[in-house]
């Protein structure tokens, strides 16, 4: 609901290009907060796995994916889903596997946007 209110406010006060970018940033930031909270609550070791998961997988995949795509596009949603899946399995994965998974999500985002 809050995202919809911000989205309407942005669209009524600025041009289409800048509002799309601002909406993408808003979605990116909110998805980062949501996925990071999921990471923190699903990890077994709070100070090791959750930090690795939040800043390696979530911020890279979800933020980059939503920033490079339009508001609520398929690639943004798929990138967020990819980060969520990676983060939910983060305590059981090595750092290398998590980084590769985030990279694949971002590559998928670039391919679907072009």
Curated annotation (Swiss-Prot):
Its main location: membrane. It is a multi-pass membrane protein. One of its GO terms (cellular component) is membrane. It is found in: Membrane. Keywords: Membrane, Transmembrane, Transmembrane helix. It comes from the Eukaryota. The chain crosses the membrane at residues 21-41, 65-85, 93-113. Almost completely overlaps SMI1. This is Putative uncharacterized protein YGR228W. It comes from Saccharomyces cerevisiae (strain ATCC 204508 / S288c) (Baker's yeast).
